[in-house]
Regions:
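Glycine-rich, acidic loop segments that terminate in or are immediately followed by a histidine
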Residues: 2-107
Length: 107
């Protein structure tokens, strides 16, 4: 399993499009994408089918990590998004999501 965490340089409304474009190619990958634009912060967690099969749930992960950006969110087991009002917390939110993923994977 591979875990990728990155801040992306585009507006939050494009996170969903990118996630759904990449997901079919990433069976063994967990991705955490974050973006800050126009005073807004967004976080997305995308899990490949093999990762979901191991019991991970993107919605649970994004809800927990969103606390760092004073936000909330949700979604489906394979994809979830959160928005928040604290852009300066994005790095901590992405780290929290990565930590949760690795913990659930037994790393």
């Amino acid at each position: 399993m591979t875990v990728r965490v990155t801040e992306v340089p585009f507006a939050g409304e494009h996170l969903r499009d990118v996630a759904f474009m990449l997901r079919p190619r990433l069976r063994n990958v967990a991705m955490v994408l974050g973006t800050k634009a126009d005073g807004k912060v967004n976080l997305a967690v995308v899990l490949g089918d093999d990762v979901v099969a191991r019991g991970l749930n993107a919605s649970e992960i994004v809800r927990e990590a969103a606390r760092e950006i004073q936000g909330g969110g949700g979604g489906q087991p394979f994809f979830a998004m959160a928005g928040g009002k604290r852009p300066e917390g994005l790095d901590r939110a992405m780290e929290a999501a990565e930590r949760l993923i690795n913990t659930k994977l037994g790393r």
